[in-house]
Amino acid sequence: MDGIKYAVFTEKSIRLLGNNQYTSNVESGSTRTEIKHWIELFFGVKVVAMNSHRLPGKGRRMGPIMRHTMHYRRMIITLQPGYSIPPLIEKRT
């Protein structure tokens, strides 16, 4: 299982960081239990709650044919007070 695809940085997700809530896109086939276990194991934190929603795919025109991109799942992960996840941003030099 690949788990988390990447962290999401939107206006809403940055606002939620103040509430100790982290937003990320995850594999669409994974369950909440798998993601919770993976986050607690990998980052060493305690997850209090998880909210998820599935975002629809967008339409893409490929010549005369209209196709759709794959949908994906976004999770909002709430941690216990005192725990935090380090930033998932790589520095470019």
From Swiss-Prot:
One of its GO terms (biological process) is translation. It comes from the Eukaryota. SUPFAM superfamilies: Ribosomal proteins S24e, L23 and L15e (SSF54189). GO terms for molecular function: rRNA binding; structural constituent of ribosome. Keywords: Chloroplast, Plastid, Ribonucleoprotein, Ribosomal protein, RNA-binding, rRNA-binding. The keyword Kinase does not apply. It is found in: Plastid, Chloroplast. Signal peptide: none annotated. The keyword Ribonucleoprotein applies. Part of the 50S ribosomal subunit. Binds to 23S rRNA. Belongs to the universal ribosomal protein uL23 family. This is Large ribosomal subunit protein uL23cz/uL23cy. It comes from Nymphaea alba (White water-lily). The lineage of its organism: Eukaryota, Viridiplantae, Streptophyta, Embryophyta, Tracheophyta. The gene is rpl23-A.
